[in-house]
C-alpha cells in the first residue's frame, strides 16, 4: 500500500497548497459560472465546479480534456488561463494545467501565502 501512495506523490512536480478560493470561470462561448479552487500551485489547480463538471450535461468526459478554461479570481485581481487535464464527473472536480496568468507575480504570491 505504501508504494501506491509514493507513486501518486511522484506525479506532481510541485507541492499543492490547500485553499478555498471562489472564482468565476469561462469555458468557450457557452459555459460560465462559479466554482472554487481546492488546491493550487504555480503550474496547476484542482477546481470544484459541479455546474460545469456533471454527468447530466450530455458532454462526455473526453470532451472536457484539452479544453481551454479561463479562471477569474476577483478577490486577487488575477485571471488564470489553463487547459483541463482531468475531470471527475461524480465529484464535480477537474484539474487545470496553467498556461498563463494576467499577473504572474500576484499568482506566485497567492501560491506562497500561508
State what each model feature region is.
Residues 8, 13, 91-114:
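C-terminal output/interaction extensions
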Residues 19-27, 61-77:
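Short conserved beta-strand and strand-loop elements enriched in small hydrophobics
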Residues 39, 86-88, 100:
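A residue-level detector for short acidic-glycine micro-motifs
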Residues 1-53, 111-114:
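N-terminal helix initiation/capping motif
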Residues 34-37, 80-85:
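Short beta-strand-centered aromatic/proline hotspots
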Residues 49, 73, 82-84, 97-100:
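Residue-level recognition of conserved beta-strand positions in structured domain cores
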Residues 8-11, 58-60, 69-70:
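Short boundary/loop segments of OB/S1/cold-shock single-stranded nucleic-acid-binding domains
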Residues 54-59, 105-106:
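Short, conserved charged micro-motifs
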Amino acid at each position: 500500500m505504501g508504494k501506491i501512495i509514493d507513486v501518486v506523490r511522484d506525479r506532481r512536480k510541485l507541492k499543492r497548497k490547500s485553499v478555498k478560493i471562489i472564482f468565476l470561470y469561462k469555458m468557450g462561448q457557452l459555459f460560465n459560472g462559479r466554482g472554487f479552487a481546492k488546491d493550487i500551485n504555480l503550474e496547476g489547480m484542482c477546481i470544484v465546479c459541479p455546474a460545469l463538471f456533471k454527468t447530466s450535461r450530455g458532454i462526455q468526459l473526453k470532451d472536457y480534456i484539452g479544453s481551454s478554461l479561463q479562471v477569474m479570481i476577483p478577490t486577487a485581481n488575477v485571471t488564470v488561463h489553463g487547459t483541463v487535464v482531468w475531470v471527475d464527473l461524480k465529484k464535480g472536480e477537474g484539474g487545470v494545467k496553467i498556461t498563463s496568468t494576467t499577473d504572474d507575480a500576484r499568482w506566485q504570491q497567492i501560491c506562497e501565502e500561508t
